[in-house]
A protein has these predicted regions:
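OB-fold/S1-family single-stranded nucleic acid-binding modules
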Residues: 111-142
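Conserved hydrophobic positions within beta-strands
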Residues: 52-54
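Bacterial N-terminal signal peptides
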Residues: 7-18
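Short nucleic-acid-contacting surface segments enriched for D/E, G, S/T with interspersed K/R
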Residues: 89-106
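Beta-strand/loop nucleic-acid-binding surfaces
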Residues: 78-94
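Short aromatic-glycine-enriched beta-strand elements
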Residues: 60-70
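Short boundary/loop segments of OB/S1/cold-shock single-stranded nucleic-acid-binding domains
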Residues: 25-48
Length: 146
């Protein structure tokens, strides 16, 4: 009973803390950017693969996630649309398994017309995300068909 009560209390505290974190202006702007990015059309003929460092990740409730990365040794930045939180969680990708500073390799496609989002981020859709050691974090081909 004590363990169950402690678990419930911890879940409540985490929920409260995440509400405060998501209410700041930067988080709201990132969530809005993720929603905009998830609605974009992507060009299957404009493939891109980057070896980059995670700058930020956004896990909105009702839209696809977004991972913002910075390419090492350059000024290139990308905002990659992923999938909804439940679909990513089924693959093991969450805010606990992918953190700012992590080095990853992302393969995907650019938005139609090479559109930018936010302050100069290349808009793209992630099809495959792996760690440097080859561990697969996200694979669009493994998402359930709609």
């Amino acid at each position: 009973m004590k363990t169950q009560s402690a678990g419930i209390l911890l879940a409540m505290l985490l929920g409260i803390a995440s509400c405060f974190a998501q209410g700041n202006p930067e988080s709201i702007a990132l969530t809005n950017a993720a929603q905009t990015l998830s609605a974009m059309a992507f060009d299957s003929g404009s493939g891109v693969t980057v070896h980059a460092r995670v700058a930020s990740a956004v896990w909105p409730e009702r839209a696809a996630g977004m991972i913002v990365v910075e390419v090492g040794g350059s000024t290139e930045k990308y905002a990659f649309s992923t999938a909804g939180v439940p679909a990513m969680a089924k693959q093991g990708l969450s805010r606990f398994t992918l953190k700012p500073g992590d080095e990853i390799i992302v393969t995907g496609v650019l938005a139609n017309g090479n559109l930018k989002i936010g302050p100069g981020f290349n808009a793209a859709r992630a099809d495959l995300i792996t760690r440097i050691d080859g561990t697969r974090l996200f694979d669009r081909t493994q998402l359930p068909l709609r």
